[in-house]
């Protein structure tokens, strides 16, 4: 073979499309359904047993009358849709069962190349003139006939003649026949700042023109980045390129994955000015903590952090001079790459990195607009929005939530308009039904008045009786257990559940308090409104990585998340369906309201988290701890422990909860039943010898738990 045919063959291969996925033409909204409000118009039927979303995209892609589809991750169902979110009479709604995929050309607000494939809904020219409908010949006659293929719908801007200036339209002004619509190129519509970690634009090709691989696919290039978990701009392309993690770009596949500078950057315009960023914080972190600028310099396990300007014991790419916008000073915890929380490389050679979960989360509540006394039962103000800023539903309304409290059912509390009230004496203050279909009720943008003295709950414990909860076949004998979670031993805790992300990886613990409800820690989730599609609860196994076919294993999708009252650090998870109770899966009892566990009570913690080398973290570990009073606990913690928290004694040996255990139970044995008295939350240092551990006190929030489960 001569050199010319060989050269042509190489050129042909270099321009080959590669393993292109049909999903590349779609944009996804996780945990979302698209509803059409007109009953006369219906979607396509559900097609079951579709292998995955790619197969569904392959069905929808070639069809001119298919513009989107729903994909049910649990049932592998696929439903084709003839409309998008920009179509008239449609509404997006949060969903716990499916994702919405829409063709990019129909939902982009910018154009690719000259915009021939643009199918958006802009209908006004750059000069502000309304567009003429393509089906009309007046005031400007033309030769174009609308079809499904050319997309000449209504009076939307289009580019049927491939004009280099982009989409245009005939105008309704007889004096101006046609005009450009001035729709920006996707390369210019959104620019990037710093290293592009906050970029959320629509560019899906590299600077050299190669198309990017989808983040939710693992082919042709496998990668560790989970959509919604790692929200990055890094471009993984399909044309023989791997990703590079220093700004948007990619590196050739002949080089192994490594942290290096980009050689094929994404086609995005860089900005010299910093965009409006989330405010920096010093003592807490918001979201994923990218704006945290405090001075914590140890991990949640108490391991000192490695300096960012050092390459020992761990080599890395985060040189402070390359990431000046990330404030990588000394060895302070930071989040330069958009992980789920601030983190650092550790000073231990055997532990590369760890999260700094001991840094508390900032509250995301809106500013209170008024105050109340006591529990707010006598509050008669006019505040009508929740602590998250959601408008309250009128008490007389039947939608979106059917109220249990009306004028007739609460004669002593005037339920006027949509004002915040407390008709049921909720101990956490005035509340309301909300106008958000996914949030039945929430507490209001109110605070306790400064001159109001909250009654103490630290009083004598009263009698507790339980029936069918908190039972297990075998339990650790508190008298004969050997303290070896850190310092724990393998054991059975049938109400302890494992929370799993989309990849099936354990990330937190939880407690089964009802057949369809799990209580866990707020620290386990980046937001109270994040999509739970693909997230599951695993029950009925002692193993962090159970074998396929394990008979008692149950894995149930999470359907809904409800964040607890302000300051609670709690989250209730509603499951897609009830669990099946058996010897391996049992409910744990909830304590009476405001119950205080007597000092000296023996309790246990359970989890699959970090053991710091003291045990087997592949199985469920249990450790025994003894409750101490808040007064004794505050001697060590310098008065920082609140009444809504409780403590266990520090032991000589390192015994306690660490990363991966958060959200799990502190269960105390009372009257022959195990009772959920505390929830594991990050402490300043986990399992520190002679140092009391702090837990959220469940009894303070048990009325909220019952209320959420009752209202669904």
From Swiss-Prot:
UniProt keyword annotations, A-Z: Disulfide bond, Glycoprotein, Kringle, Repeat, Secreted, Serine protease homolog, Signal
Classification via Gene3D superfamilies: Hepatocyte Growth Factor, Plasminogen Kringle 4, Trypsin-like serine proteases
Disulfide bridges in this chain: 56-78, 60-66, 110-186, 131-169, 157-181, 284-362, 305-344, 333-356, 371-449, 392-432, 420-444, 469-589, 508-524, 603-668, 633-647, 658-686
Signal peptide segment: 1-18
Gene Ontology BP annotations: negative regulation of gluconeogenesis; proteolysis; regulation of cAMP-dependent protein kinase activity; regulation of receptor signaling pathway via JAK-STAT
Positions of the Peptidase S1 domain: 485-710
UniProt PTM: Cleaved after Arg-484, probably by HPN/Hepsin, to yield the active form consisting of two disulfide-linked chains.
All residue ranges annotated as the Kringle domain in the record: 109-186, 190-268, 283-362, 370-449
InterPro entries: HGF/MST1 (IPR024174), Kringle (IPR000001), Kringle-like (IPR013806), Kringle_CS (IPR018056), Kringle_sf (IPR038178), Pan_app (IPR003609), Peptidase_S1_PA (IPR009003), Peptidase_S1_PA_chymotrypsin (IPR043504)
GO molecular function, one term: receptor tyrosine kinase binding
Domain PAN, residue spans: 21-105
SUPFAM superfamilies from the UniProt entry: Hairpin loop containing domain-like, Kringle-like, Trypsin-like serine proteases
CC per GO annotation: extracellular space
Glycosylation sites: 72, 297, 394
A family per Pfam: PAN_1
Localisation per UniProt entry: Secreted
Assembly information from the UniProt record: Dimer of an alpha chain and a beta chain linked by a disulfide bond. Interacts (via beta chain) with MST1R (via SEMA domain).
Family to which the UniProt record says this protein belongs: Belongs to the peptidase S1 family. Plasminogen subfamily.
Name of this protein: Hepatocyte growth factor-like protein
Organism listed in the record: Bos taurus
Gene expressing this chain: MST1
């Amino acid at each position: 073979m001569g050199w010319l045919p060989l050269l042509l063959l190489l050129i042909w291969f270099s321009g080959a499309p590669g393993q292109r996925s049909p999903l590349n033409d779609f944009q996804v909204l996780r945990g979302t359904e698209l509803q059409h409000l007109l009953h006369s118009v219906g979607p396509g039927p559900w097609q079951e047993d579709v292998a995955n979303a790619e197969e569904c995209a392959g069905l929808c892609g070639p069809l001119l009358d298919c513009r989107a589809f729903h994909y049910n991750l649990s049932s592998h169902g696929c439903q084709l849709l003839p409309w998008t979110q920009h179509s008239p009479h449609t509404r997006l709604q949060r969903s716990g069962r499916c994702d919405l995929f829409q063709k990019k050309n129909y939902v982009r607000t910018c154009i690719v190349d000259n915009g021939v494939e643009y199918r958006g809904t802009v209908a006004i020219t750059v000069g502000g003139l309304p567009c003429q409908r393509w089906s009309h010949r007046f005031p400007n006659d033309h030769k174009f006939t609308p079809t499904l293929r050319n997309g000449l719908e209504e009076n939307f801007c289009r580019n049927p003649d491939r004009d280099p200036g982009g989409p245009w339209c005939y105008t309704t002004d007889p004096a101006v026949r046609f005009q450009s619509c001035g729709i920006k190129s996707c390369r210019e519509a959104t620019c990037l700042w710093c290293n592009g970690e906050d970029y959320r634009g629509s560019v899906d090709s590299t600077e050299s023109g190669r198309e990017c691989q989808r983040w939710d696919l693992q082919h042709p290039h496998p990668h560790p980045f989970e959509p919604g978990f790692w929200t990055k701009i890094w471009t993984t392309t399909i044309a023989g390129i791997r990703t590079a993690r220093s700004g948007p770009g990619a590196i050739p596949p002949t080089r192994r994955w490594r942290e290096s500078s980009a050689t094929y950057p994404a086609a995005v315009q860089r900005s010299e000015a910093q965009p409006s960023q989330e405010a920096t914080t010093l003592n807490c972190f918001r979201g994923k903590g990218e704006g945290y600028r405090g001075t914590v310099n140890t991990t949640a396990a108490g391991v000192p952090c490695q300096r960012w300007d050092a390459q020992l014991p761990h080599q890395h790419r985060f040189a402070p001079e390359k990431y000046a916008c990330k404030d990588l000073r000394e060895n302070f915890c930071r989040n330069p790459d958009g992980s789920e929380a601030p983190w650092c490389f550790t000073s231990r050679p055997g532990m590369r990195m760890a999260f700094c979960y001991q840094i508390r989360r900032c509250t995301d509540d809106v500013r209170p607009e008024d105050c109340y006394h006591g529990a707010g039962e006598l509050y008669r103000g006019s505040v009508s929005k929740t602590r998250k800023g959601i408008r309250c539903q009128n008490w007389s309304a039947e939608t979106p939530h059917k109220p249990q409290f009306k004028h007739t059912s609460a004669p002593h509390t005037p339920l006027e308009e949509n004002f915040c009230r407390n008709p049921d004496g909720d101990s956490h203050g005035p509340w309301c039904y909300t106008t958000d279909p996914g949030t039945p009720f929430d507490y209001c943008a109110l605070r306790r008045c400064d001159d109001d003295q909250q009654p103490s709950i630290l009083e004598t414990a009263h009698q507790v009786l339980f029936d069918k909860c908190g039972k297990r076949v075998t339990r650790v004998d508190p008298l004969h257990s050997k303290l070896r979670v850190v310092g724990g031993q393998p054991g059975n805790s049938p109400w302890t559940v494992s929370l799993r992300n989309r990849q099936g990886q354990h990330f937190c613990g939880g407690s089964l308090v009802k057949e369809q409800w799990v209580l866990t820690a707020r620290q386990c989730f980046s937001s109270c409104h994040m999509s739970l599609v693909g997230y599951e609860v695993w029950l009925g196994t002692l193993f962090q990585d159970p074998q396929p076919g394990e008979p008692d294993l149950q894995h149930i999708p999470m359907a809904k998340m409800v964040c607890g009252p302000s300051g609670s650090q709690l989250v209730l998870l509603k499951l897609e369906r009830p669990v099946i109770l058996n010897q391996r899966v049992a409910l744990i009892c909830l304590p009476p309201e405001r119950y205080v566990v007597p000092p000296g009570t023996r309790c246990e913690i359970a989890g699959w988290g970090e053991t710091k080398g003291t045990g087997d973290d592949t199985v469920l570990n249990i450790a025994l701890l003894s409750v101490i009073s808040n007064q004794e606990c505050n001697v060590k913690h310098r008065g920082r422990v609140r009444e809504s928290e409780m403590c266990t004694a520090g032991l000589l040996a390192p015994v306690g909860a660490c990363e991966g255990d958060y959200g799990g139970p502190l269960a105390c044995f009372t009257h022959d039943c195990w009772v959920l008295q505390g929830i594991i939350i990050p402490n300043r240092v986990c399992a520190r010898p002679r140092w009391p551990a702090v837990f959220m006190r469940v009894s303070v929030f048990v009325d909220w738990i019952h209320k959420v489960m009752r209202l669904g």
